[in-house]
């Protein structure tokens, strides 16, 4: 019985020693990050879709903040994201990458033909935002509110049962152009 207590005490002392060494090492060798990179990364949609040409939002935030990369490459963020980045980084807004005439392309979401889905889960593994639900050997479904339309789930599908479909505009997702709506300003008298 005493051998068990000796083993427990020895392992506890060893764990404490390793904890102290790791704690010291984390403070001693800490790498300081640029706060602007953290702020830009927090502004990005975190879809990790790769449409910007970078493997995720963090590398794109580093490229925009430190290397002067174009701020118009975030597809899921769209024009609103580009304007926020321009304001944050004190640069001029740029037209969205792609066709200059198309300012806001129609939003697309993935759609699964459930009659052909075999439940292989390859699309679930490829989806960077977990917008596809389902389990092995069961039919999968896309949660359209979470889908960013990045099309990363289409190529791994062995039965080609996934396609991107445009979302019809509704009052909830319509891009309101508030600058073209006439506004009448009424002067109000103030009484003391």
UniProtKB/Swiss-Prot annotation:
Lineage: Bacteria, Pseudomonadati, Pseudomonadota, Gammaproteobacteria, Enterobacterales
4Fe-4S ferredoxin-type domain ranges (all copies): 108-137, 138-167
Domain 4Fe-4S, first and last residues per copy: 32-91
Subcellular location: Cell inner membrane
Database matches in PROSITE patterns: 4FE4S, 4FE4S_FER_1, 4FE4S_FER_2
Positions contributing to [4Fe-4S] cluster 3 binding: 127, 147, 150, 153
Residues binding [4Fe-4S] cluster 1: 49, 52, 57, 74
Co-factor remark: Binds 3 [4Fe-4S] clusters.
Listed cofactors: [4Fe-4S] cluster
Gene3D superfamilies tied to this protein: 3.30.70.20, Electron transport complex subunit B, putative Fe-S cluster
Family membership: Belongs to the 4Fe4S bacterial-type ferredoxin family. RnfB subfamily.
Coiled-coil blocks: none
Region of interest called Hydrophobic, as start-end residue ranges on this chain: 1-26
Record InterPro entries: 4Fe-4S_dom, 4Fe4S_Fe-S-bd, 4Fe4S_Fe_S_CS, Elect_transpt_cplx_RnfB/RsxB, RnfB/RsxB_Proteobac, RnfB_subfamily
Species in which this protein is naturally found: Pectobacterium atrosepticum (strain SCRI 1043 / ATCC BAA-672) (Erwinia carotovora subsp. atroseptica)
GO-annotated cellular components: plasma membrane
HAMAP family recorded: RsxB_RnfB (MF_00463)
Record-level GO BP terms: electron transport chain
Entry's EC annotation: 7.-.-.-
Keywords, sorted A to Z: 4Fe-4S, Cell inner membrane, Cell membrane, Electron transport, Iron, Iron-sulfur, Membrane, Metal-binding, Repeat, Translocase, Transport
The protein's enzyme class: translocase
Function recorded in the entry: Part of a membrane-bound complex that couples electron transfer with translocation of ions across the membrane.
Name of the molecule in the record: Ion-translocating oxidoreductase complex subunit B
A GO molecular-function descriptor: 4 iron, 4 sulfur cluster binding
């Amino acid at each position: 019985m005493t051998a068990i207590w000796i083993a427990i005490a020895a392992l506890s002392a060893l764990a404490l020693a390793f904890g102290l060494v790791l704690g010291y090492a984390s403070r001693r060798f800490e790498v300081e990050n640029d706060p602007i990179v953290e702020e830009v990364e927090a502004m990005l949609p975190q879809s990790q879709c790769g449409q910007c040409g970078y493997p995720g939002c963090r590398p794109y935030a580093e490229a925009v903040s430190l290397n002067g990369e174009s701020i118009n490459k975030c597809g899921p963020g769209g024009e609103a994201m580009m304007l926020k980045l321009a304001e944050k980084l004190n640069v001029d807004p740029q037209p969205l990458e792609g066709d200059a005439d198309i300012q806001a392309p129609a939003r697309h979401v993935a759609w699964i033909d459930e009659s052909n889905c075999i439940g292989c889960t390859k699309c679930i593994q490829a989806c960077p935002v977990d917008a596809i639900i389902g389990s092995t050997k069961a039919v999968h479904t896309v949660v359209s509110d979470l889908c960013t339309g990045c099309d990363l789930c289409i190529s791994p599908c062995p039965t080609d049962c996934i396609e991107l479909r445009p979302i019809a505009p509704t009052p909830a997702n319509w891009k309101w152009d508030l600058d073209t709506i006439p506004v009448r300003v009424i002067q109000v008298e103030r009484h003391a």
